[in-house]
C-alpha cells in the first residue's frame, strides 16, 4: 500500500528546494506518472487518465499553441471551459507554451467578459463556447495536435489570473504566481499536522470531486492543487444536478469534497425532508441516534464517525455512500444545523475560509464534533497571519496572497497584507466570520447591524433562497419561491418566520417581508450578493411584492428604484410583520387546491365531494392516483411515503395530512 505520509514529505521537500514556479509545481505533480490523474464517465463507463497520459496531451497542446501563435508568447490567453480533462490540458499547455492563462468566469455577462479580456489585451481564447467572435478562438475539442512524450524546451510562464467577483459587480482580476500556489500546497501540510483525516482514502484511493468551477479560487486551489499536487485523482461530472452529483460520488467512490455551502444545504434539506415524512417512531429513533453519535464523536472522534455511519446506514446509502472521508465547506456561511446533521450521520464536514485575493487560509480542523459544528473557520494555516483592522475587519498576511490586483482603475501590487472586509471575532485562537462590513445596516438607535447575523440564525424551510438586506431604507427579508409554489404554504411559512424573528438576534429590526417568484441569485452563485440583488430589483429583473399585499396573485409588478409615494408615507416603525391569514382562509384555500388536483388527476371538471373516496366513489385508477400523488408532492414540496401513509383517499384526508407536515 502506498505510503501517503512519505509521499507528502518527499513532494514538499522537492518543491521547497525549487524556485517555486509553475513549472516546478508541474514537475513534482506529474512525477507520479502511473497515478490516475482524473476519471469521468464515458458511454456509461468509468474512463481513467494517468498523469503520464495527461502530460503527453499537455505537451502536445503547448507545442500547438507555440507553433500556431509565436507572436503571442508571453501574453495572456483566455480560458473558458467547464471542469474537464480539456481544461487541465489547456491550463498547463498555456503555461508551458510561455503564455499566461486567464481563467474566465463563465457566469459573467458577455459584455463583462469582453471588457476584462480587453483590459488584459487578450487576443486568443481557448473555449468551446460561442460568444467570442471578436477573438481568435481555439477549441481544444476540435483543434488538431499530437500527443508528445516530451515538453517544450521553452521558458514557461509563471503567472495565472482569475476574476475576484462571482457576481461581476466591481470585478477585479487577481494575479498569482507559482510561489502563491506553493503556499497553498503547504496548507495541506498544515492540515495534516492538525488532522490526519485529510489523507484517509477508500479502497486505497483518494478521489476529489471537481464540483466548483476552476475559475473560482476555491475550485482551483482546494479542489485541484491542494491534493492533486500529491498525485491524487480528480473526478469530473457531466452536470451539477443533485442526482448526478450523488450518482457520481457513489459510482466513483469519491472520498473528498470541497464545495460551497449550497451543496451541503441541499444534502441537509433532502435528509430532513425525507425524515419529516417518516413516522414519529422513526423520527425519535433518528434523533436518539444523533444524540448518541454526537456524544461518541466528542470523546472518540474517528471511532464516533465509524459508529455514526453504522447507525445511519440507510441515510448514508441514500446520499453520498460510504466512501466519503473529508469534506470542507467554504465560500459562504454554512448553517450550523447542516453542519451538525451531516457530521452527525458520519460525514466529516469542516468549515473553511478564504477569498479570491488570499486563496484558502484556514479551516476548522479540530476533530471533536462540538468544534466542527461551532461555525468557526479555524486558525490560519502555517505561514499565514490573521489580524483585525480598526474597523473590526479581517486582515490576512501570508504567502498565498495574490501578487497583483488589476482593476479598471489601475493596478495594486502592495498586497503583503490584504483587508478582506469581513467582520470577524477570535475565540481562543479560532476565528468566526460574522458578516461583511459593506452590508452593515444602521439601526434606529445608530447601532451597526450585520444582516448576516439575522440571516444565519433564521430558519426558512421552503423558500429556494432568501436574503436579509436594506430595501428602501428598511431592513427587509426577501423570500424566493417557485412560480407554482402554493400561496397557502408561503403564508404558513411567513407566519413561522415572524415568530422566529422574535428570538433571532436583531430579528425585530426586520421591518418588511417581500415575496418574489423571480430568482434572486444566479443558478451557479456560491452565495447571494445583496448588491447584485438590489441591482436586479432596480432593473425590474426581480419583482418584489410586499407581504402586506400578498394575496395569492401570481402577477407581481416590478418595483422602481425609488419607493412609491405610498411607501414614502410609511413610517419607520410600521412593520410588515402584522398580517396573519385566518385559519378558515387556510382551510378553504388548501381544500380548493387539493380538489383541483383531484380534478386534474381524474381529468374531470365535475365538482369533487371532499369526502368522496378516490377509488370507490370517483372511479380513479392506480395510474390516476400516482398522478395525484406526484402533483401534490411537487406542488406542496412534500415527499409522501405511501408505505407510511396508506390511508389517503379523500380531499379531506390529504388536507389533514398536509396541515400536519407543512
Region roles according to the model:
Residues 50-52, 157-186:
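Conserved AMP-binding A3 loop
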Residues 499-576, 629, 644:
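Conserved C-terminal "lid"/linker of ANL adenylate-forming enzymes
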Residues 1-68, 73, 157, 550-587, ...:
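N-lobe entry segment of adenylate-forming
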Residues 560-608, 627-635, 647, 652, ...:
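Thiotemplate assembly-line natural product biosynthesis machinery
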Residues 388, 392, 412-414, 418-506, ...:
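AMP-binding/adenylate-forming catalytic core of the ANL superfamily
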Residues 185-207, 214-313:
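Conserved AMP-binding/adenylation subdomain of ANL enzymes
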Residues 44-49, 62-107, 210-211, 307-432, 437-440, 455, 617:
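Conserved AMP-binding/adenylate-forming
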Amino acid at each position: 500500500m502506498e505510503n501517503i505520509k512519505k509521499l507528502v514529505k518527499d513532494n514538499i521537500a522537492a518543491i521547497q528546494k525549487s524556485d517555486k514556479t509553475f513549472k516546478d509545481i508541474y514537475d513534482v505533480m506529474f512525477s507520479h506518472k502511473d497515478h490516475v490523474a482524473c476519471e469521468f464517465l464515458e458511454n456509461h463507463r468509468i474512463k481513467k487518465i494517468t498523469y503520464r497520459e495527461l502530460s503527453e496531451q499537455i505537451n502536445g497542446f503547448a507545442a500547438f499553441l507555440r507553433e500556431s501563435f509565436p507572436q503571442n508568447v508571453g501574453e495572456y490567453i483566455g480560458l473558458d471551459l467547464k471542469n474537464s480533462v480539456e481544461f487541465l490540458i489547456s491550463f498547463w499547455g498555456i503555461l508551458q507554451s510561455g503564455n499566461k492563462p486567464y481563467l474566465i468566469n463563465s457566469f459573467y455577462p458577455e459584455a463583462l467578459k469582453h471588457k476584462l479580456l480587453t483590459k488584459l489585451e487578450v487576443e486568443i481564447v481557448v473555449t468551446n463556447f460561442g460568444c467570442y467572435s471578436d477573438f481568435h478562438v481555439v477549441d481544444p475539442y476540435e483543434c488538431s495536435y499530437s500527443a508528445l512524450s516530451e515538453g517544450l524546451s521553452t521558458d514557461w510562464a509563471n503567472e495565472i489570473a482569475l476574476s475576484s467577483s462571482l457576481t461581476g459587480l466591481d470585478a477585479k482580476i487577481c494575479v498569482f504566481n507559482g510561489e502563491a500556489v506553493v503556499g497553498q500546497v503547504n496548507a495541506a501540510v498544515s492540515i495534516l499536522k492538525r488532522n490526519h483525516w485529510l489523507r484517509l482514502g477508500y479502497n486505497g484511493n483518494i478521489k476529489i470531486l471537481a464540483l466548483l468551477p476552476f475559475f473560482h479560487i476555491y475550485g482551483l486551489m482546494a479542489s485541484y492543487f491542494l491534493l492533486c499536487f500529491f498525485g491524487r485523482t480528480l473526478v469530473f461530472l457531466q452536470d451539477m444536478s443533485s442526482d448526478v452529483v450523488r450518482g457520481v460520488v457513489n459510482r466513483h467512490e469519491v472520498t473528498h469534497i470541497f464545495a460551497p455551502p449550497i451543496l451541503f444545504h441541499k444534502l441537509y434539506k433532502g435528509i430532513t425532508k425525507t425524515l419529516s415524512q417518516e413516522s414519529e417512531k422513526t423520527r425519535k429513533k433518528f434523533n436518539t441516534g444523533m444524540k448518541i453519535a454526537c456524544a461518541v464523536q466528542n470523546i472518540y472522534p474517528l471511532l464516533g464517525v465509524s459508529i455514526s455511519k453504522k447507525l445511519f446506514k440507510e441515510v448514508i446509502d441514500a446520499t453520498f455512500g460510504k466512501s466519503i472521508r473529508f469534506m470542507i465547506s467554504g465560500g459562504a456561511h454554512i448553517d450550523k444545523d447542516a453542519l451538525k446533521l451531516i457530521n452527525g450521520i458520519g460525514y466529516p464536514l469542516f468549515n473553511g475560509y478564504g477569498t479570491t485575493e488570499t486563496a484558502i487560509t484556514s479551516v476548522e480542523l479540530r476533530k471533536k464534533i462540538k468544534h466542527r459544528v461551532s461555525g468557526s473557520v479555524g486558525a490560519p494555516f502555517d505561514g499565514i497571519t490573521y489580524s483585525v483592522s480598526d474597523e473590526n475587519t479581517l486582515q490576512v498576511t501570508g504567502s498565498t496572497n495574490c501578487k497583483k490586483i488589476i482593476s479598471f482603475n489601475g493596478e495594486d501590487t502592495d498586497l503583503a497584507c490584504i483587508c478582506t472586509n469581513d467582520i470577524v471575532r477570535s475565540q481562543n485562537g479560532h476565528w468566526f466570520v460574522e458578516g461583511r462590513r459593506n452590508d452593515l445596516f444602521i439601526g434606529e438607535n445608530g447601532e451597526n447591524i450585520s444582516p448576516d447575523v439575522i440571516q444565519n440564525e433564521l430558519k426558512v424551510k421552503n423558500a429556494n433562497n432568501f436574503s436579509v438586506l436594506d430595501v428602501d431604507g428598511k431592513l427587509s427579508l426577501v423570500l424566493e419561491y417557485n412560480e407554482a409554489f402554493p400561496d397557502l404554504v408561503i403564508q404558513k411559512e411567513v407566519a413561522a418566520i415572524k415568530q422566529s424573528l422574535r428570538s433571532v438576534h436583531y430579528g425585530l429590526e426586520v421591518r418588511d417581508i417581500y415575496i418574489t417568484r423571480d430568482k434572486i441569485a444566479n443558478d451557479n452563485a456560491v452565495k447571494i450578493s445583496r448588491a447584485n440583488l438590489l441591482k436586479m430589483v432596480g432593473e425590474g429583473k426581480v419583482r418584489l411584492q410586499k407581504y402586506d399585499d400578498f394575496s395569492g396573485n401570481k402577477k407581481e409588478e416590478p418595483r422602481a428604484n425609488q419607493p412609491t409615494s405610498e411607501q414614502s408615507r410609511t413610517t419607520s416603525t410600521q412593520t410588515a410583520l402584522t398580517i396573519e391569514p385566518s385559519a378558515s382562509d387556510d382551510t378553504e384555500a388548501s381544500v380548493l387546491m387539493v380538489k383541483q388536483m383531484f380534478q386534474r388527476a381524474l381529468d374531470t371538471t365535475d365538482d369533487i365531494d371532499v369526502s368522496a373516496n378516490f377509488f370507490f366513489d370517483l372511479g380513479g385508477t392506480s395510474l390516476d392516483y400516482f398522478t395525484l400523488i406526484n402533483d401534490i408532492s411537487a406542488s406542496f414540496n412534500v415527499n409522501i411515503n405511501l408505505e407510511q401513509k396508506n390511508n389517503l383517499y379523500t380531499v379531506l384526508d390529504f388536507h389533514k395530512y398536509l396541515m400536519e407536515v407543512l
